[in-house]
Amino acid sequence: MVLTDPIADYLTRIRNANMVRHESLVVPASKMKKDISEILKREGFIRDYEVIDDDKQGVIRIFLKYGKNNERVISGLKRISKPGLRSYVKSDAVPKVLNGLGIAIISTSEGVITDKEARAKNVGGEVLAYVW
């Protein structure tokens, strides 16, 4: 199956698994998805992830995180830059998500980083997604 937007598929799988409160989910692996998973883990949106290597592409198993009383940690995920309409920002226009409560995931020349890191490094790039 050919996907035109693998990042949107990745975010949708996380959103769907989160809505029905699954413990984990599996997505096809890529370097970009590994980088985004690392950011989500570091920022506390997911519990953990592991890369399972098979003879082909490999998969990433993501372990979702829930709070007390099984409440969701991820309230929302939104794809910003799409294949048909790319969204780039300069270093002085890096967006804040919900006044700092969420994160923007940005692909820069420094790699895939959060909006806070982009402001600290004074770099812009392609805004991939918002997570809150």
UniProtKB/Swiss-Prot annotation:
<comment type="subunit">
    <text>Part of the 30S ribosomal subunit. Contacts proteins S5 and S12.</text>
</comment>
<protein>
    <recommendedName>
        <fullName>Small ribosomal subunit protein uS8</fullName>
    </recommendedName>
</protein>
<comment type="function">
    <text>One of the primary rRNA binding proteins, it binds directly to 16S rRNA central domain where it helps coordinate assembly of the platform of the 30S subunit.</text>
</comment>
<keyword id="KW-0687">Ribonucleoprotein</keyword>
<dbReference type="InterPro" id="IPR000630">
    <property type="entry name" value="Ribosomal_uS8"/>
</dbReference>
<dbReference type="GO" id="GO:0006412">
    <property type="term" value="P:translation"/>
</dbReference>
<dbReference type="GO" id="GO:0019843">
    <property type="term" value="F:rRNA binding"/>
</dbReference>
<dbReference type="GO" id="GO:0003735">
    <property type="term" value="F:structural constituent of ribosome"/>
</dbReference>
<keyword id="KW-0694">RNA-binding</keyword>
<keyword id="KW-0699">rRNA-binding</keyword>
<dbReference type="GO" id="GO:0005840">
    <property type="term" value="C:ribosome"/>
</dbReference>
<dbReference type="InterPro" id="IPR035987">
    <property type="entry name" value="Ribosomal_uS8_sf"/>
</dbReference>
<comment type="similarity">
    <text>Belongs to the universal ribosomal protein uS8 family.</text>
</comment>
<keyword id="KW-0689">Ribosomal protein</keyword>
<dbReference type="InterPro" id="IPR047863">
    <property type="entry name" value="Ribosomal_uS8_CS"/>
</dbReference>
<dbReference type="GO" id="GO:1990904">
    <property type="term" value="C:ribonucleoprotein complex"/>
</dbReference>
<dbReference type="Pfam" id="PF00410">
    <property type="entry name" value="Ribosomal_S8"/>
</dbReference>
